[in-house]
Amino acid sequence: TPEGYGRVRDIETDPDLTVIDAIIANGKIQNMDAILLHLAKMKATHGEGKLYASLLTNVDFNNAFATAKNIQNKGLLLYGPFVRSGTNCSRFVAAVIKASGPSFIKRIRLKYPFCISPSPKRNVCITNHHYYVVENQKCIQVKKSKWKAYFSSIEI
């Protein structure tokens, strides 16, 4: 993409993006560690350093997916955290989460972030106070109370 622009990618548009199918039993993803370790290794899905991830349950997947595809179908997008009417990875993720129908509090926290623009870590901690950190080929699950997660750093 040209300088200052980005685009939404998926396995149809970028063959180097691969995903591991979730194994679900009793309503829970059984291979979450394997999925996250795979994503953390891929330069196409993750920059450098720790990977943070969380799960959002009870969502409208179809609406979230349609929102992601609608943004993707726009083609090249102005890219940057402070670009008006533009996007970046965190803004894209926040838009898709909002479209999934989260609770009122989560929608408000996503719409009005503490910082000027959504950030990856903020999206993770808004989504769930139980989250994952992947570093050095290890996947750690962090469980905090809602209160502690709201007022403390996501760092472990």
Residue ranges of model-derived segments:
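Non-catalytic ligand/cofactor/substrate-binding and regulatory segments of enzyme domains
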Residues: 1-78, 141, 146-156
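Activation targets extended, charge/polar-rich intrinsically disordered C-terminal tails
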Residues: 69-156
